């Protein structure tokens, strides 16, 4: 029997306050998150942004206990998925690959090779594909394949997205139904889906299918919810977590909450649709920030649907996905990362400091130039960082 490695890909998160700055640096150093015309600027800019944002982010993590639970939950998901797959007769071992914090993708790949795995199923824990989530993780795997001959020889099957998978849709509907039934008048409860946003340019210029998949997923979940409850609920969809000056896909979560309050909504059932684990966006942004906003807007009951975590229906759905991937047509890394639109992909190679004397000089000049601009803006109180809310 072939030994199957199931590679669960996720974002990662700082487990301690002192990890917040390095974690943010890793995010902003990813060219799929901030796209620059000159790759040499990537790391200096990542350092600058992570330095400026660390204090605010540290405060948010302190508000939820001092660190992200994402790794712990993802490892629990991996263990339960592995157990269920083995019960189904699949000789599977689960591995966790985080994009921006430990355990990194390189570590998971090293474990896969050390364990003598025969083939790999790549399962991103993002139901909906986006350049900045699944896309970036697939591209990191491509980079590792190019630089590691033994890993390159290993057969890989990818699951690109699974927003429409019955197990996922059913699990979401079941958890929503539990919260709707708690309302004073359940059939009048407003089901409010909040998804992580992405820049509008990703969708319109790069062909990112994320928004279409989110909208289609919402429709599927509401249909399943109506089947469970026997009645339909009003619902709405918005996008959260936007940063910077660029326009993101709309409507925005904070604006829709205010509009619902003005319209007289009393019972709000909030659904974190693009998150399968509890982390900073659910525990701080939704549970604290948006709960306060809803109260100010006049909404009486704010009920947040828990993230899927290790909910049995969800784990069963993940096992079904792995089984279908093994039995169905192969989707390789190139196919999984492909986009319909024209977009320039930037190399995922980590930019090395000090490759030679010339590069060291340019690194120093760039860093000094950025630092000088930063000091000038601090002194003057005006500049692009103030304009986008970083200072």
UniProtKB/Swiss-Prot annotation:
Pathway involvement of the protein, from the record: Porphyrin-containing compound metabolism; protoheme biosynthesis; protoheme from protoporphyrin-IX: step 1/1
Family that this chain belongs to: Belongs to the ferrochelatase family.
Keyword Cytoplasm applies: yes
GO cellular component, one term: cytoplasm
Keyword Nucleus on entry: no
Enzyme class: lyase
Catalytic activity line of the entry: heme b + 2 H(+) = protoporphyrin IX + Fe(2+)
Listed GO biological process terms: heme biosynthetic process
Positions bound to Fe cation: 196, 281
Main location: cytoplasm
Sorted UniProt keywords: Cytoplasm, Heme biosynthesis, Iron, Lyase, Metal-binding, Porphyrin biosynthesis
Matches recorded under InterPro entries: Ferrochelatase, Ferrochelatase_AS, Ferrochelatase_C, Ferrochelatase_N
Protein purpose: Catalyzes the ferrous insertion into protoporphyrin IX.
This protein's name: Ferrochelatase
Location of the protein in the cell: Cytoplasm
EC code(s) of this entry: 4.98.1.1
Gene Ontology MF term list: ferrochelatase activity; metal ion binding
PROSITE patterns (UniProt xref): FERROCHELATASE (PS00534)
């Amino acid at each position: 029997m072939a030994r199957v490695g199931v590679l669960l890909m996720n974002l990662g998160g700082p487990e301690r306050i002192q990890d917040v700055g390095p974690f943010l640096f890793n995010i902003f150093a990813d060219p799929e998150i901030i796209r620059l015309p000159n790759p040499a600027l990537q790391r200096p800019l990542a350092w600058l942004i992570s330095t400026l944002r660390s204090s605010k982010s540290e405060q948010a993590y302190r508000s939820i206990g001092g660190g992200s639970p994402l790794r712990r939950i993802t490892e629990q998901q991996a263990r339960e998925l592995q157990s269920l797959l083995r019960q189904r007769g699949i000789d599977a071992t689960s591995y966790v690959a985080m994009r921006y914090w430990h355990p990194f993708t390189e570590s998971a790949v090293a474990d896969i090779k050390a364990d003598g795995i025969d083939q790999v199923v790549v399962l991103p824990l993002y139901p909906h594909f986006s350049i900045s989530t699944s896309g970036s993780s697939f591209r990191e795997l491509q980079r590792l394949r190019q630089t590691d001959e033994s890993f390159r020889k290993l057969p890989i099957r990818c699951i690109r997205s699974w927003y429409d998978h019955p197990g996922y849709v059913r699990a979401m509907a079941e958890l929503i139904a539990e919260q709707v039934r708690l309302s004073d008048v359940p059939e009048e409860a407003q089901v409010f889906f909040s998804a992580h946003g992405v820049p509008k340019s990703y969708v319109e210029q790069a062909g990112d299918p994320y928004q279409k998949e989110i909208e289609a997923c919402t429709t599927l979940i509401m249909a399943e919810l109506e089947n469970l409850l026997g009645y339909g609920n009003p619902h709405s969809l918005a996008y959260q977590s936007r940063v910077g000056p660029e326009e993101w896909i709309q409507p925005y979560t904070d604006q829709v909450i205010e509009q619902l309050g003005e319209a007289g909504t009393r019972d709000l059932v909030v659904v974190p649709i693009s998150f399968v684990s509890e982390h900073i966006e659910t525990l701080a942004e939704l549970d604290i920030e948006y709960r306060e906003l809803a109260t100010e807007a006049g909404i009486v009951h704010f009920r947040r649907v828990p993230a899927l975590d290790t909910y049995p229906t969800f784990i069963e759905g993940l096992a079904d996905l792995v089984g279908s991937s093994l039995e169905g047509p192969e989707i390789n890394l190139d196919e999984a990362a492909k986009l319909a639109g024209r977009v320039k992909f930037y190399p995922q190679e980590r930019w090395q400091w000090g490759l030679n004397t010339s590069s060291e000089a340019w690194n120093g000049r760039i860093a000094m130039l950025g630092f000088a601009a930063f000091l000038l803006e601090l002194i003057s109180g005006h500049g692009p960082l103030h304009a986008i809310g970083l200072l």
